[in-house]
Regions:
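Macrodomain-like recognition of ADP-ribose-binding/processing modules
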Residues: 1-180, 186-205
């Protein structure tokens, strides 16, 4: 079962929690800071991995300790100062989906990967996470950013065809219509005339 909700990730009863991290060993903000305070041994393990340059975008890893704590540290950005990229989140989700069975994950709770300090939009991240994980045979709780409209927590919203740009951030590129290309070429030729006046709004409207 897959469900999106608003609430406290740490109150989830899921077997495995997902933490968003960078690749330089800093957990200074957001949900990562809370993970650091709650699970200091996990942070030391994470810091050791980053010191060895063993953590890469697109390759989350499972941390498990003797007490039964299971945390997936999921890199959403290279440096903590950098924005998150949707393409990196997608690669990480593919990796997580491929390893979930091997990691013996029976239930999963995760934050809105790359949103907040990462700068990504829930309207892109939520549907992407649903697309990549909803078919897994486990219970999944996806915690949306506070203030997310209820309609954007529904399966109808999450399963709708997205307009994601996996080159990074923002919406899908819209191809230029042929008439726009012709118009741009006319404007370019006008501007190239040696004694041409600048093309103002009136002339532009007449050409259009």
């Amino acid at each position: 079962m897959f469900r999106a909700l608003i609430g406290d990730l740490f109150e989830s009863q899921a077997q495995t929690l997902v933490n968003t991290v960078n690749c330089v060993g800093v957990m200074g903000k957001g949900v990562a800071e809370q993970f650091k305070r709650r699970f200091p041994e996990m942070f030391e393990d994470y810091k050791s991995r980053t010191d060895r340059k063993a953590l890469r975008l697109g390759e989350p890893y499972l941390y498990r300790d003797s007490s039964g704590v299971q945390i997936v540290n999921f890199p959403t950005k290279d440096h903590w100062r950098s924005p998150s990229r949707l393409a990196d989140v997608e690669r990480g989700l593919d990796y997580l989906a491929a390893h979930a069975a091997g990691w013996e994950i029976t239930s999963l709770a995760l934050p809105p990967l790359g949103c907040g300090n990462g700068g990504l939009e829930w309207s892109e991240v939520g549907p992407l996470i649903y697309q990549k994980l909803h078919d897994l045979p486990i219970d999944i709780e996806l915690f949306a950013p506070y203030g997310t409209p209820k309609q954007q927590l529904t399966e109808e919203f999450l399963s709708a065809p997205s307009q994601m740009s996996l080159e990074g951030r923002g919406r899908k590129h819209v191809p230029l219509r042929p008439e726009w290309v012709v118009l741009m070429e006319v404007l370019r030729e006008l501007e190239a005339q040696p004694y041409a006046s600048p093309v103002g709004r009136t002339i532009f409207q007449k050409i259009s």
